[in-house]
From Swiss-Prot:
<feature type="transmembrane region" description="Helical">
    <location>
        <begin position="146"/>
        <end position="166"/>
    </location>
</feature>
<feature type="transmembrane region" description="Helical">
    <location>
        <begin position="7"/>
        <end position="27"/>
    </location>
</feature>
<protein>
    <recommendedName>
        <fullName>Protease HtpX homolog</fullName>
        <ecNumber>3.4.24.-</ecNumber>
    </recommendedName>
</protein>
<feature type="active site">
    <location>
        <position position="132"/>
    </location>
</feature>
<keyword id="KW-0378">Hydrolase</keyword>
<keyword id="KW-1003">Cell membrane</keyword>
<keyword id="KW-0812">Transmembrane</keyword>
<feature type="binding site">
    <location>
        <position position="135"/>
    </location>
    <ligand>
        <name>Zn(2+)</name>
    </ligand>
</feature>
<dbReference type="InterPro" id="IPR001915">
    <property type="entry name" value="Peptidase_M48"/>
</dbReference>
<keyword id="KW-0862">Zinc</keyword>
<keyword id="KW-0479">Metal-binding</keyword>
<feature type="binding site">
    <location>
        <position position="202"/>
    </location>
    <ligand>
        <name>Zn(2+)</name>
    </ligand>
</feature>
<dbReference type="GO" id="GO:0005886">
    <property type="term" value="C:plasma membrane"/>
</dbReference>
<feature type="transmembrane region" description="Helical">
    <location>
        <begin position="177"/>
        <end position="197"/>
    </location>
</feature>
<dbReference type="GO" id="GO:0004222">
    <property type="term" value="F:metalloendopeptidase activity"/>
</dbReference>
<feature type="binding site">
    <location>
        <position position="131"/>
    </location>
    <ligand>
        <name>Zn(2+)</name>
    </ligand>
</feature>
<dbReference type="GO" id="GO:0008270">
    <property type="term" value="F:zinc ion binding"/>
</dbReference>
Length: 285
């Protein structure tokens, strides 16, 4: 229930932001257009944002015939978690990473890169996919996917405003201060992600994944490997769509500056330490 409230609040906040931007660019007419655009974006984000994200990564759906071992692993873990079977996707990228998306557990999808399948052992892959299914079980996937698509839309609108400026309803040039304000919208998009996606969510998914797999150590060693390998392998699709970085099990961004705003992951060392403590004590708290 809390995630539903959080999602509704996020949509309302972004709608208000779009209206403000519309006013900066085109006065009252711009505000009306922005409101209609925001309502359309809200509808689109709820129903289609998962498909949009999967398309951004050129993810290919697989089944028991095309990726039998991986598909059966996800099915077994979904059964252990008492979840419906999600759609399963592979992304042809060398960088090791994975994410979950969808609007609810009944319409969920999990995706992994071909790189992560090469780097991790089967036991470690189980830990990673259990983590992603924990996101599904906790209903994190709707807000994370909507946030990614909305932040991307705001950044695109900011770029449009910076290049084309704007005029008010009387045809006069818009307030020059508005241009400066609009130029700051990309950082605002990053800030929205920081507010909406808490680092605590990753810790909870680590804990939930450990419960599903029954093997916290496998996720700990997987995170260590992903962290080490990912540092030297660029994830081109993620670099092109930095607003989606918060969906990944590990931050895929290597750039500095603006891209750091989209980093929402806790320190890998702390995640590993917590998981190893679970393995030592047998307590998933």
């Amino acid at each position: 229930m809390f995630n539903w409230v959080k999602t509704a609040m996020l949509m309302a906040a972004i709608t208000a932001l779009f209206i403000v931007i519309g006013g900066m660019i085109g006065g009252s007419r711009g505000m009306t257009i922005a409101l209609l655009f925001a309502l359309g974006m809200n509808f689109f984000s709820y129903w289609f944002s998962d498909k949009m994200v999967l398309r951004m990564y050129n993810a290919q759906e697989v089944d028991e015939n095309t990726a039998p071992q991986f598909y059966r692993m996800v099915r077994e873990l979904a059964t252990r978690a008492n979840l419906p079977m999600p759609r399963v996707y592979l992304i042809n990228e060398d960088a090791p990473n994975a994410f979950a998306t969808g609007r609810n557990p009944e319409h969920a999808a999990v995706a992994a890169t071909t790189g992560i399948l090469r780097v991790l052992s089967e036991r470690e892959m189980r830990g990673v996919m259990a983590h992603e299914l924990a996101h599904v079980k906790h209903r994190d996937i709707l807000i994370s996917t909507i946030t990614a698509t909305m932040a991307g839309a705001i950044s695109a609108l900011a770029n449009f405003a910076m290049f084309f400026g704007g005029r008010d309803e009387n045809g006069r040039p818009a307030n020059p201060i508005a241009g400066i304000a609009v130029a700051l919208l990309a950082p605002i998009a990053g800030a929205l992600i920081q507010m909406a996606i808490s680092r605590a969510r990753e810790f909870e998914a680590d804990r939930g994944g450990a419960q599903i797999s029954g093997d916290p150590q496998s996720l700990a060693t997987a995170l260590d490997k992903i962290h080490r390998y990912a540092a030297g392998i660029p994830f081109q699709a993620a670099e092109a769509h930095p607003a989606t970085a918060q969906m990944m099990i590990m931050n895929p961004l290597h750039g500095g500056g603006l891209q750091n705003l989209f980093s929402t992951h806790p320190a890998t060392e702390e995640r590993i330490a917590r998981l190893m403590e679970m393995a030592r004590t047998g307590r998933f708290e």
